[in-house]
Amino acid sequence: IIEGESVTGVTTMQMDEGLDTGDMILKTEIPIAEDETGESLHDKLAEAGAALCVKTLHAIENKTAVFEKQPESPTAYAKMLTKDLGNIDWAKSAVQIERLVRGLNSWPSAYTHRDGKVMKIWKALAKPQEECAEQTELGSEEHTAQKTGKNAMPGTVVSVAKDSFCIQTGDGVLRILEVQMPGKKRMDTGSFLRGYKVEEGMVFGRE
């Protein structure tokens, strides 16, 4: 998800001395949805993996299993997920950050800093610049992003609405839809904004 892949999958293989180098037996592909999260993909892979294990055992028992050598090309291994990986670099593009948010949901989660506190971001959408450049309204006050806009420093809030706010990235803006503050439950951004003040020009990412 983080790397923007559209397909993943599960493979059963024969054990040997190497790391994931044994002959392949069966495999199945799983398409990655546009709104896929690490948690939803984990559940899909777990279900597919269990079914594939049963199918593989039957094939071995019936002596119909076909063992296929892996390609000679270098193997790419996925890096371990760590909490530090979730620290959002707002200089990256909105698309990259959205993928990070989805890929690290539910563990270890993507996060940024606000007033010296960690704010986890559980749901966000990458949006074109112009979608957050329009005049928006929060309560009885009107806000406009004209004073910030696409020339704002990455991490800067460029617009605030009743149910979301947009943060400038290195390319595009990220609309924040679900967050969590320390000691609090996850909440949609509309609920968050009723208890926390977010204004245009505010900068996220500073510890």
Indicate where each model-derived feature is located.
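Short helix-capping and hinge/turn segments at secondary-structure transitions, especially at repeat
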Residues: 55-65, 86, 102-109
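An anion-binding loop in the catalytic cleft
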Residues: 90-207
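Donor/substrate-binding cores of folate-linked one-carbon enzymes
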Residues: 1-80
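Acyl-group handling in specialized metabolite and lipid biosynthesis
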Residues: 79-92
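Short amphipathic alpha-helical segments
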Residues: 28, 84-86, 172-174
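Short, flexible active-site loop motifs that bind/organize anionic cofactors or intermediates
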Residues: 31, 87, 182
